[in-house]
């Protein structure tokens, strides 16, 4: 009985892993239309956020969204080339704190939830954005 | 009457927490819960995280209450924990262990209290970011009120200091594309039943190195399921002290409040076997 249970759990883990690993993140996000929807949601959420919205007062929204679409496409294996500033350059002079970075994470999660992205896809995208933290904060 | 803190104190304190909402800080759930020994962690096991959600610079104070009911015993614990700059944590815990009616002759106090004063220092790494997992060292000074009972059972003393080292990491998008928290701690201890039955024993006064482990999977940012295992020393002769384990569900609706419900298996306590039951824990922060 215990063996059966373990076998069932193992096969569950195996299937879950293979199904998710087979899906390119870019496709899981819904390809170009999905990424566009995601970026619209994220930029709106950032702009309206009480704590980080002020950082976007002078931002050219169209330019910002175009670069963010490229970047998300690039890091999700969608094959795009990111043509914007480096992360250090883009956040230079802002001196973002760790708390503000966390506000961005929270806002991104809210935006993705509102836009209907599943938790697993949210986690995968955030896992790929997380390594950039060092290039974003305290610049 | 500080010797026997009432659960009511915690219940009175906790609802205040959301009014003093910390509006910014770390991501929620990254402060863990207040453990039975007041340090931030899971239910039974301290983690390398700092209580609450302070970042640099910042101070955060957390209050927690837990209640454990197994076959023949109850354990209530109340903890206060403060952290500075996501670096250093001080905690104060008060536990009350109660033996169920009928197990002891009339006239003997069925309650044992213990005070735990803790300090924890984050020494390296980060819970989520960078190459290294978060690491911390901690000390816990424990004072058990059970000098007579513990002495009669063979314990050498009723207060002692324990040291531990914890490594904790949140893995983003692990199996099932879920975020997983893993913790491993090593503790040097001479405690009998975490100190409730004193420390050391006649004929063996060495510290034991014990391992304590937690694993949790976040279904989503609000709900996690997990398990813990806490190794314990051999204990007093004839009492059959066991390792402790639990399986829990945690609800973290925001940065200020969390609730965990667990099934705990405390094995044999004071020669009474099959001590499994329910554990409930609440943590709120300012």
What are these regions (language model features)?
Chain B
Residues 1-33:
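Cleavable N-terminal export/targeting peptides
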Residues 16, 65-66, 201:
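A generic structural signal for short
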Residues 22-174, 219-223, 233-235, 240, ...:
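Transmembrane beta-barrel domains of Gram-negative outer membranes and organellar outer membranes
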Residues 155-235, 243-244:
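Detector for outer-membrane/organellar transmembrane beta-barrel domains
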Residues 245-286:
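C-terminal appended segment following the main domain
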């Amino acid at each position: 009985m215990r063996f059966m249970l373990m076998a069932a759990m193992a096969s569950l883990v195996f299937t879950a892993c293979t199904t998710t690993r087979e899906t390119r993140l870019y496709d899981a996000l819904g390809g170009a239309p999905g990424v566009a929807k995601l970026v619209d949601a994220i930029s709106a959420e950032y702009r309206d956020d009480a704590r980080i919205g002020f950082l976007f007062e002078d931002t050219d929204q169209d330019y910002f969204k175009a670069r963010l679409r490229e970047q998300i496409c690039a890091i999700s294996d969608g094959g795009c080339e990111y043509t914007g500033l480096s992360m250090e350059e883009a956040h230079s002079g802002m001196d973002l704190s760790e708390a503000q970075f966390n506000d961005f994470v929270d806002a991104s999660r809210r935006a993705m939830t509102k836009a209907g992205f599943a938790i697993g896809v949210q986690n995968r995208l955030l896992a790929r954005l997380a390594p950039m933290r060092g290039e974003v904060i305290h610049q | 009457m500080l010797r026997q803190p009432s659960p009511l104190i915690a219940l009175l304190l906790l609802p205040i927490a959301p009014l003093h909402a910390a509006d910014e800080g770390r991501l929620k759930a990254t402060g863990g819960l207040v453990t039975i020994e007041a340090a931030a962690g899971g239910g039974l096991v301290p983690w390398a995280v700092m209580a609450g959600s302070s970042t640099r610079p910042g101070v955060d104070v957390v209050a927690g209450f837990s209640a454990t009911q197994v076959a023949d015993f109850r354990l209530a614990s109340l903890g206060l924990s403060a952290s500075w700059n996501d670096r250093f944590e001080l905690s104060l815990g008060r536990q009350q262990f109660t033996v169920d009616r009928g197990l002891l002759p009339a006239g003997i106090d069925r309650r044992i209290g213990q005070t735990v004063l803790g300090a924890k220092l984050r020494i390296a790494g980060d819970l989520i970011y960078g190459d290294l997992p978060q690491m911390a060292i901690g000390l816990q000074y424990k004072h058990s009120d059970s000098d007579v009972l513990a002495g009669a059972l063979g314990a050498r003393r009723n207060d002692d200091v324990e040291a531990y080292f914890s490594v904790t990491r949140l893995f983003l998008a692990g199996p099932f594309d879920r975020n997983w928290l893993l913790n491993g701690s090593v503790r040097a201890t001479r405690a009998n039943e975490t100190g409730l039955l004193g420390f050391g024993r006649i004929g063996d006064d060495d510290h034991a190195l014990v391992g304590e482990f937690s694993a949790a999977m976040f279904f989503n940012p609000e709900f996690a399921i997990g398990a813990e295992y806490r190794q314990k020393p051999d204990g007093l002769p004839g009492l059959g002290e066991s390792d402790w384990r639990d399986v829990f569900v945690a609800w973290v609706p925001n940065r200020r409040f969390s609730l965990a419900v667990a099934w705990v298996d405390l094995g044999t306590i004071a020669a009474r076997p099959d001590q499994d039951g329910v554990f409930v824990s609440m943590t709120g922060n300012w």
